[in-house]
């Protein structure tokens, strides 16, 4: 790139050509059934998409968790963000990859796509698309330097969860990295354990099933990655980082 020239978001060298494979798409029934109030209603979106609300939902850990996830990526990388996120996460990730990088944000809900586009309007390196990441082959193999899945897996049923994980692992190029940040089974002594059990039963119907097995065990592709897992806040949250070998 010549000095003084700004990156062009339409430039195919910035966003990966054909990284998102076209497919038939509809709002999944599980999303309508369990999360219409949170992700498909513009009235609640305006209330939920506030830094203070996001911080409260994560018991004051939102900024810490976002920073820790974003720090796993580097300027100039092509990164896929799986699902839109309330709060400032996408902006932080766009800032991290910088003007010479590219951020593709993907969500199945048109409302969330429109909302994220508004947040990222000032970042020419960012692109937001509508796609269902549980559709096999929806992302081209090896298309990204990095993939980030921030608090998505606990919101999908097990079958869809396994397909999403498999698709995201396939999207990482050799030497690239994938980062999962999500809930984790808290320590027995955790004072919030009873509260979170109630939250999961009443508001997050698929969360408990996430704890039944390690995230990486849900795809055979994980054998091609080196994994590091850390937990924080008494084990309530986890960060799983995989680096693809080869």
Regions found by a protein language model. Give the residues of each.
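A short SAM/SAH-binding and catalytic strip from SAM-dependent methyltransferases
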Residues: 145-159
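C-terminal alpha-helical "lid/dimerization" subdomain adjacent to the S-adenosyl-L-methionine
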Residues: 179-223, 227-236
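N-terminal, positively charged/glycine-rich alpha-helical extensions of SAM-dependent methyltransferases
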Residues: 1-49
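Conserved alpha-helix/loop element of class I SAM-dependent methyltransferases that forms part
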Residues: 56-76, 88, 92
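A short glycine-rich, Lys/Arg-flanked "PGG" loop and its adjoining helix->strand segment in the class I
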Residues: 162-174
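Helix-to-beta-strand junctions that scaffold the AdoMet/dcAdoMet cofactor pocket
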Residues: 98, 156-157, 172-174
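Class I SAM-dependent methyltransferase SAM/SAH-binding core
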Residues: 78-136
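A short acidic, Gly/Pro-enriched loop at the edge of an enzyme's catalytic core
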Residues: 134-147
């Amino acid at each position: 790139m010549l000095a003084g020239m700004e990156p062009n978001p339409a430039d195919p060298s910035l966003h990966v050509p054909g990284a998102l494979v076209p497919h038939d798409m509809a709002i999944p029934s599980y999303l309508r059934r369990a999360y219409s109030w949170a992700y498909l209603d513009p009235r609640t979106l305006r209330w939920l998409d506030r830094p203070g609300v996001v911080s409260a939902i994560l018991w004051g850990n939102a900024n810490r968790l976002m920073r820790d996830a974003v720090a796993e990526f580097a300027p100039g990388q092509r990164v896929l963000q799986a699902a839109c996120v309330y709060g400032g996460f996408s902006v932080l990730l766009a800032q991290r990859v910088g003007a010479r990088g590219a951020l593709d944000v993907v969500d199945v809900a048109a409302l969330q796509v429109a909302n994220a586009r508004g947040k990222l309007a000032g970042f020419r390196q960012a692109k937001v698309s509508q796609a269902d990441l549980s559709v096999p082959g929806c992302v081209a193999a090896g298309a990204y330097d990095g993939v980030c899945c921030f608090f998505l897996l606990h919101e999908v049923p097990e079958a869809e969860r396994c397909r999403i994980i498999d698709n995201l692992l396939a999207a990482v190029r050799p030497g690239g990295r994938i980062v999962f940040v999500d809930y984790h089974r808290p320590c027995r002594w955790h004072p919030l354990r009873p509260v979170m059990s109630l939250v999961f039963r009443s508001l997050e119907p698929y969360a408990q099933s996430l704890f039944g097995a390690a995230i990486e065990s849900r795809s055979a592709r994980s054998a091609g990655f080196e994994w590091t897992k850390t937990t924080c806040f008494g084990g309530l949250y986890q960060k799983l980082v995989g680096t693809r070998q080869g």
